[in-house]
């Protein structure tokens, strides 16, 4: 049995891509997108009609150019999601504009709009996850959205404080990053090579997984952002793992044995009192890696959102 099939027996495999052909090839349960993946998918020729349709939709909705652009980018993200939902049995994750990462109300409004666009296309809420950056404001937005029956995927998660706040807010799923944590440690320390078991990203996700299971939180842990297959195999047993096509291919081509690494069998402990905003910032800011990577991730997604807007504007 190849490693991908072995992994499927213990972990829900998710494709981290907007490329329909790649998704068809590996038959994941779910798929995740982000502004960077939407931007790269938009360059694929088969997506040209989706862009044209999004622009036509936006022009019909408003005469204001700025509003048309907002409507077109939202509709395009949903159009790509709709195509992906034709080939996955489970859920699509669609991300809120990263520029709203520190604005709870705008995040809630954008999430409701994206859900409405999916609903108009006949897709029920149980097939969608709204992706939101794991800022305090994003977590508070998700807490409200969950109460409305809108499930959320909290992304750009690098610290234990972020993970704890997400669980306490009752969010459906978190995406703790692995590879970007490794990147930071390689760039900021003398150690340049890590065995998979001691990879700081693997250690972080393992710690979060165990904390959730120890305290009986139902929030799904979906490891994300992988730099090599060793990080993935070291997290076998995690609730879900979202994996880029190149690494799905590598796993599929490997016949090496796969051992379950994550499985909590201990007793469930009492949960601590929920964190306050002050406690969240204090604990999160104790981790310079998490502070830098959260800010950088938001900036990068915002830059790609702006590139997407420029691409759309050129087609108006």
From Swiss-Prot:
One of its GO terms (biological process) is carbohydrate metabolic process. It comes from the Bacteria. Keywords: Cytoplasm, Pentose shunt, Schiff base, Transferase. GO terms for molecular function: transaldolase activity. PROSITE patterns: TRANSALDOLASE_1, TRANSALDOLASE_2. InterPro entries: Aldolase_TIM, TAL/FSA, Transaldolase_1, Transaldolase_AS. It catalyses: D-sedoheptulose 7-phosphate + D-glyceraldehyde 3-phosphate = D-erythrose 4-phosphate + beta-D-fructose 6-phosphate. It is found in: Cytoplasm. The active site is at residue 131. It is an enzyme of class 2 (transferase). Its EC number is 2.2.1.2. Pathway: Carbohydrate degradation; pentose phosphate pathway; D-glyceraldehyde 3-phosphate and beta-D-fructose 6-phosphate from D-ribose 5-phosphate and D-xylulose 5-phosphate (non-oxidative stage): step 2/3. GO terms for cellular component: cytosol. Homodimer. Transaldolase is important for the balance of metabolites in the pentose-phosphate pathway. PANTHER family: TRANSALDOLASE. Belongs to the transaldolase family. Type 1 subfamily. This is Transaldolase. It comes from Glaesserella parasuis serovar 5 (strain SH0165) (Haemophilus parasuis). The gene is tal.
């Amino acid at each position: 049995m190849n490693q991908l099939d072995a992994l499927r027996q213990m972990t829900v495999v998710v494709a981290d891509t907007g490329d329909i052909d790649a998704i068809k090839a590996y038959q994941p349960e779910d798929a995740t997108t982000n502004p960077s993946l939407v931007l790269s998918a938009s360059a694929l020729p088969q997506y040209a009609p989706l862009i044209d349709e999004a622009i036509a939709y936006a022009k019909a909705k408003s005469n204001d150019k700025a509003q048309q652009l907002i409507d077109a980018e939202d509709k395009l993200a949903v159009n790509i999601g709709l195509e992906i939902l034709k080939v996955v049995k489970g859920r699509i994750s669609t991300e809120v504009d990263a520029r709203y990462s520190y604005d709870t109300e705008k995040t809630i409004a954008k999430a409701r709009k994206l859900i409405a666009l999916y609903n108009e296309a006949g897709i029920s809420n149980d097939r969608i996850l709204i992706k939101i950056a794991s800022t305090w404001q994003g977590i508070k937005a998700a807490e409200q959205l969950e109460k409305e029956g809108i499930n959320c995927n909290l992304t750009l998660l690098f610290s234990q404080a972020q993970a704890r706040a997400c669980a306490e807010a009752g969010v459906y799923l978190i995406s703790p990053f692995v590879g970007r944590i490794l990147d930071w440690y390689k760039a900021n320390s003398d150690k340049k090579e890590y065995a998979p078991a001691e990879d700081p990203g693997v250690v972080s996700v393992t710690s979060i997984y165990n904390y959730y299971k120890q305290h009986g939180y139902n929030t799904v842990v979906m490891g994300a952002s992988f730099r090599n297959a060793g990080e993935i195999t070291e997290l076998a047993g995690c609730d879900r793992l979202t994996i880029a096509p190149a690494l799905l291919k590598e796993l599929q081509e490997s016949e090496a044995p796969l051992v379950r690494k994550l499985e909590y069998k201990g007793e469930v402990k009492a949960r601590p009192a929920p964190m306050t905003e002050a406690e969240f910032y204090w604990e999160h800011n104790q981790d310079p890696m998490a502070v830098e990577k959260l800010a950088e991730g938001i900036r990068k997604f915002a830059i790609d959102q702006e590139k997407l807007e420029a691409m759309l504007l050129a087609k108006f």
